[in-house]
């Protein structure tokens, strides 16, 4: 019987050496384990990640309170339930927490249990997790957003924007796309060395050199694509997709350099330039005209709705505009964005909302309204590869899970290789069809 017998949580360490929650779920004849990720640049509207706050232990970042909630109240409530009743399990935990932002039990407690239950349910059913969640039509491998150059909150350097990414859009298989990313990563490393620049990496495995400007960062990435022997696209303003093998994606994480008091975007790490919302939107419009950019995530701050609308009206027909801090994987925030006509894509981070059911609901709402969904990691990760399974389960078509270094990032890429191998001829790589621009 798939009845939950025991739920056991523990405190482990993530890729930044900070505590996080790991959960084991036991039934009579199945088992599931999940570890919870954590972000560095977090949106103010995210569900609450419960930390202990004791500065003498792990600098206040311990998660023993969340662990205790799993081992006591959540365990007591879910014991005896069928592990295969995912929605009922998640709804029971939401009722138990009773707050709109999971602040009582902690989203990190709820998510660990939710994902571990799904894994135990999949094992009981004799199915891989992607098939258990997504059914027989789950067969689309995602186009990766590979974060090869870091700045912003993810690196101690002079670059304001958080992530400069490559997207292999001109390939017929995931494995070939991944190979191109790895080769471009190594070409970029060689290029940086030749210029006397640092090849130290940031939280997500991308390089984090000190550069003269934000423009130099994107130009280095473009140069590395060519150095690796791949064809970079041109600006989408000039119909630049064509036979492109690689396009550029950005995550400036604009909330991180938005000064709410001044209502200005301040380039604190580089030029000290201050831009209004209109000027920031015009900045991205120029970049989208000058460079082969196919996607911009969080191009405006999380509560700058007017700025988001300006940006969407300017370039939303030709560039994927992804809401991360804007939508925080929350159906209410996403519904508001749809109503206001801002963005055209949602970044999906399971720990922003706290349960698998709510995550799937957000993806469904996006899809029904013509928005794409990008399944995403966090900067603080573990060896857990659940998001790779979710990407295939939902046929999302895109995944964002870091650079081509650090085993916490490679765990997801390698899991997708295994899934592609398992699917065989059924496996689909969407390439440019993953985008709706």
Swiss-Prot record:
GO biological process, one term: glycolytic process
Cofactor note: Binds a second Mg(2+) ion via substrate during catalysis.
Binding site for (2R)-2-phosphoglycerate: 162, 349, 378-379, 400
Pfam families per UniProt: Enolase_C, Enolase_N
InterPro entries, sorted: Enolase (IPR000941), Enolase-like_C_sf (IPR036849), Enolase-like_N (IPR029017), Enolase_C (IPR020810), Enolase_CS (IPR020809), Enolase_N (IPR020811)
Active site location: 204 (proton donor), 349 (proton acceptor)
Cofactor: Mg(2+)
Protein name per its UniProtKB record: Enolase
Organism: Chlorobium phaeobacteroides (strain DSM 266 / SMG 266 / 2430)
């Amino acid at each position: 019987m798939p009845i939950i017998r025991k739920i056991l949580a523990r405190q482990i360490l993530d890729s930044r050496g900070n505590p996080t929650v790991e959960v084991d779920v036991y039934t009579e004849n199945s088992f599931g384990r999940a570890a919870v990720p954590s972000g560095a640049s977090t949106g103010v509207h995210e569900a609450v990640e419960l930390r202990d706050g004791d500065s003498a232990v792990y600098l206040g970042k311990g998660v023993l309170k969340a662990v205790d909630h799993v081992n006591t109240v959540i365990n007591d409530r879910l014991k005896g339930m069928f592990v295969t009743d995912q929605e009922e399990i998640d709804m029971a935990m939401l009722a138990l927490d009773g707050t709109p932002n999971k602040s009582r039990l902690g989203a990190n407690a709820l998510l660990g249990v939710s994902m571990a239950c799904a894994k135990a349910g999949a094992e009981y059913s004799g199915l891989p997790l992607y098939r258990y969640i997504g059914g027989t039509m789950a067969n689309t491998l995602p186009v990766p957003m590979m974060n090869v150059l870091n700045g912003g909150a993810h690196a101690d350097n002079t670059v304001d924007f958080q992530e400069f990414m490559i997207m292999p859009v001109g390939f017929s298989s995931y494995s070939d796309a991944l190979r191109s990313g790895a080769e471009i990563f190594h070409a970029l490393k060689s290029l940086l060395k030749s210029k006397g620049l640092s090849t130290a990496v940031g939280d997500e495995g991308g390089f984090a050199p000190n550069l003269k400007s934000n423009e130099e960062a994107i130009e280095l990435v473009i140069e590395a694509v060519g150095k690796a022997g791949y064809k970079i696209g041109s600006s989408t303003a000039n119909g630049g997709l064509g036979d492109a093998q690689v396009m550029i994606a950005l995550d400036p994480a604009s909330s991180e350099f938005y000064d709410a008091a001044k209502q200005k975007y301040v380039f604190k790490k580089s030029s000290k330039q201050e831009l209004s919302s209109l000027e920031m939107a015009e900045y991205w419009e120029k970049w989208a005209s000058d460079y082969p950019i196919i996607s911009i995530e969080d191009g405006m701050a999380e509560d700058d709705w007017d700025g988001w609308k300006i940006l969407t009206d300017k370039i939303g027909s030709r560039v994927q505009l992804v809401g991360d801090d804007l939508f925080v994987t929350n159906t209410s925030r996403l519904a508001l964005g749809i109503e206001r006509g801002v963005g055209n894509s949602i970044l999906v981070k399971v720990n922003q909302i706290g349960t698998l059911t709510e995550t799937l609901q957000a993806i469904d709402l996006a899809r029904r309204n013509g928005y794409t969904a990008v399944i995403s990691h966090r900067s603080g990760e573990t060896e857990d590869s659940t998001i790779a399974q979710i990407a295939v389960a939902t046929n999302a078509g895109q995944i964002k899970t870091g650079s081509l270094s650090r085993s916490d990032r490679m765990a997801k890429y390698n899991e997708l290789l295994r899934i592609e191998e398992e699917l065989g001829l059924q496996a689909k790589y969407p390439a440019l069809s993953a985008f709706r621009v």
